[in-house]
Amino acid sequence: MTAGTAVDGARAVLLDTCALIWLANGDALQPQALSAIISAGSADGIFVSPASAWEIGMLSRPRQGRSGAVSFLPDPQSWFARFVAGPGIRIAPLLPEIMIAASFLPEPIHGDPGDRLILATARHHQMPVVTRDRKIIDYASAGHARVIAC
């Protein structure tokens, strides 16, 4: 899929947390996703959900049953702030209606609160989600969202 017309009428994409991390780390992305991100960036239309900040915080803390925390240097808050200060990147507004809509997404949807908020944000602003998350891709294939696989 191509980037959608969204916030302020510009072509825009919403990065899932995994896409945000891979983009920040310079990891390889699918050509279609990279093209959509570059196009959106030229119009200040690369959006990141505040839910991704929460997910990054959760990934960075040690938890039982997990091999180790993910390092975001120098710390998760600075890492996230540095990423969203990049050219073409904006924080997507997390409005009360988006938060409520995340509780009422069309089924079938899994229970991950971060993914639900990201999907509700994308639906509200009519943006595709750039992701490699199989659950989000499957949700989109059911017609409930648009994705660009990365």
What are these model-derived regions, one by one?
Residues 1-48, 64-76, 134:
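Short, well-structured N-terminal submotif of metal-dependent ribonuclease cores
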